Structures are given as structure tokens and as C-alpha cells.
């Protein structure tokens, strides 16, 4: 089920849980929400995999042009794209060498049809939620 509390808690509290997050639409500008969220999650011990059409490295990690180019397993695909781009992102997810566990659509990113399709494909879907805010909530911290 979309936004299932157990899925969110399992992702963000698990000691051995997901550690690799592909961030689709990650900006190299420190003032952008995608950069701030990715930098925070990196600080919390997650490996960030930037997926964006330009740049060579972001947050010290090599940039991939598409999800399908990533040669190693990814636990979470975190989407910072406008809702109309979600079906194309999901199509890219389906081309990945290793199926991720989660499709996370950030705050303001809502696409019910693509979310339902992602669930049918076997992904756990979190929609219209901020990864950083949810991390803070699950760990009992006030979001800054």
C-alpha cells in the first residue's frame, strides 16, 4: 500500500536496511531541495547516487544519466521531478539491472497511476513525502 507507515519505518530505521539512494533530478546547487535532502541523507550514512542529465560528480559521487546505467544495486529511487515525469522515471526503473525496493516520490510529486503501476511491479511506494522530514520523524527529531 502506498505510504504504508511500516514501509517508511522499515526503510528509515533498519540497522541493516537500505543504504543506497538513487536521487533522480539531483541538483548540484546547494540551495535546491534535492541537494539539501541528498546531503542530509549522505550525512546520515546513506550512499547517494546522483541521476541527472548534466555534471560529472555531485556530493562527491559520480553522476549517472539514467537509472538504467547504474551497474550496482540501489535500495531507493528518490524522485525530485515534476509529477508529469514520473511515468518516464518508472520506465527507467524497469530498465535497471537490479530492481530497487522503494520508489519514493518527494513532497509535491503525486502521480497515482504511476504509483499503482510501481506497486504492481513489486515496489514499495512512498508518495508526496519528504525523505528528510520522514527520517527526522521516524527518529523522533524535529525537522530543521
Please provide the spans of the model-predicted regions:
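Active-site capping/gating segments
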Residues: 122-144
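Structural motif
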Residues: 20, 75-76, 102
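Glycine-rich, highly charged phosphate/nucleotide-binding loops
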Residues: 1-7, 57-72, 78-90
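Short, charged, surface-exposed secondary-structure boundary motifs
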Residues: 58-61, 75, 113-116, 134-141
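Hydrophobic, well-ordered beta-alpha structural blocks that scaffold small-molecule cofactor pockets
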Residues: 1-54, 59
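ADP-ribose/adenylate-binding Rossmann-like module
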Residues: 96-118
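Short, acidic/turn-prone active-site loops that include or flank metal/cofactor-
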Residues: 55, 107-110, 129-133
